[in-house]
Amino acid sequence: IGSDQVADLDGEPLGKPGDHARAVLQLRRMRGRWVVFQTAVAVVCQASGFEQLDLAPVRVRFRDLSDAEIEAYLRAEQPYDCAGSARSEGLGIALLEAIENDDPTALVGLPLIRTCRMLRAAGVQLLASAPPGAGLE
């Protein structure tokens, strides 16, 4: 199983900024706008030859962030390894006004609903093979 994500701002890909200065620029460009985070997932089983890819788009509307909010967020989270400089599972959720998608885990970076669907297609019976204590009691 592999997954990765890129932010799409009006057709322009915004990847992982890598440093503070690039993160500031990304967040300034996205403030007050809709951005689509495209999360790709792949399931490959070499033994059976199964391969499947899927894409989980997530539309996100950023708040109209002030420069001070952007600086405070970046100093606290340092999301320089996150597409679009936003880590929604942390303080990054405070940057957002709205999220639209069909898989709430996709924005975090691994669309689990799609991944489970792909694993079932590969013949993996997720619930049948769950060990005692796996939270399915």
Describe the predicted segments one by one.
Residues 1-137:
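Anionic-ligand binding patches
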